[in-house]
Regions:
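N-terminal Rossmann NAD(P)H-binding glycine-rich loop of SDR-like oxidoreductase domains
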Residues: 3-22
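SDR active-site strand-loop-helix element
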Residues: 6, 46-50, 85-91, 134-136
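Adenosine-cofactor binding site in Rossmann-like domains, unifying the SAM/SAH pocket
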Residues: 21, 26-40
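NAD(P)H-binding glycine-rich loop region in Rossmannoid oxidoreductase-like domains
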Residues: 37-66, 77, 93-97
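Conserved Rossmann-fold NAD(P)-dependent oxidoreductase catalytic core, especially the SDR/UDP-sugar
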Residues: 72-109, 132
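NAD(P)-dependent short-chain dehydrogenase/reductase
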Residues: 109, 120-177, 183-187, 218-219
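Active-site YXXXK catalytic motif of short-chain dehydrogenase/reductase
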Residues: 110, 114
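C-terminal substrate-binding subdomain of Rossmann-fold SDR/epimerase-dehydratase oxidoreductases
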Residues: 163-272
Length: 272
């Protein structure tokens, strides 16, 4: 298939592009530019990953322009051209319930932009194309180094362990549980959905949350590092998800049971 990936230079985009090409698909990429919408007509699928993904971004107009308004215009153009639209939503739209039909409680500008676009998708029943949204949980894996402070705790903890011998975690990290999913699993799941003939939004996570402390201990053991607990910054407390866990009933119904990678496999396989 001919596939366009927006945000193809990002963490998930780079991994997905390489994976789809390895499966025989023709993949091209697009990065956001002001007032430019790519033409979807030459493509069988548009996979829209491009977004401001920083949960600490404060420029709401900038977030809405790129994450909501651009997404809406691109979707409408795909509908006109007959190109299936697949896009990245986020588990950050959830509160303390994680079924796809649960009450949504976004806590920051990024999460609000994803929530509003999800709502737009589900409130417009007259699309002529399939529109598929994926609420990614906490994605980790190779290629996220460029994200800096926004990379997952895997990258942060490993860097600290290797460079300083001390891994800094927030106080109470043994009770901060997240549903971490390897980017390789995300790529495989998206490819499976290429053949799914349906419009909906699905959770994409493992369904098995692990604590920040679990990950810190794995890296501490690997690099013989110490763990130091530090206070959580006040500006994060009100917008922090202390627990996430994907409910995968809809995912399983659509593509079957997926065999997820474990965090132990990833940590132990990485080079020292």
């Amino acid at each position: 298939m001919n596939i366009l990936i927006t945000g193809h230079e990002g963490f998930i985009g780079q991994n997905l592009g390489a994976y789809l090409q390895s499966k025989g698909h023709n993949v091209e990429g697009f990065e956001w530019k002001p007032n430019i919408i790519p033409d979807p007509e030459p493509y069988d699928r548009v996979i829209h990953l491009g977004a401001i993904s920083s949960t600490t971004e404060r420029d709401v107009e900038k977030i809405m322009e790129q994450n909501y308004e651009f997404s809406m215009r691109l979707l409408q153009l795909c509908d006109q051209k007959g190109t299936t639209f697949m896009y990245a939503s986020s588990a950050s739209v959830y509160g303390d319930k994680f079924e796809e039909n649960a009450k949504l409680q976004p806590q920051n500008g990024y999460a609000w932009s994803k929530y509003l676009f999800d709502r737009f998708v589900m409130q417009v029943p007259e699309f002529m194309i399939n529109v598929q949204g994926f609420r990614f949980f906490n994605v980790y894996g190779p290629g996220e180094e460029h994200k800096g402070d926004q990379q997952s705790v895997f990258g942060k903890f490993e860097k600290q362990a290797k460079e300083t011998g001390v891994i800094k975690v927030f106080e109470g990290s043994d009770k901060i549980d997240r549903d971490f999913i390897h980017v390789g699993d995300v790529c495989e799941i998206i490819e499976k959905f290429i053949d799914v003939d349906n419009t909906d939004i699905w959770n994409v996570g493992t369904g098995t949350p692990r604590s920040f402390m679990d990950i810190a201990k794995l890296y501490a053991k690997k690099y013989n590092a110490k763990i130091e607990e530090i206070p959580m910054p006040e500006n994060l407390k009100g917008q922090y998800q202390y627990y996430t866990c994907s409910h995968n009933k809809k995912l399983i119904n659509s593509i079957g049971v997926h065999n997820f990678r474990t965090i132990e496999e990833y940590v132990n396989a990485s080079k020292t």
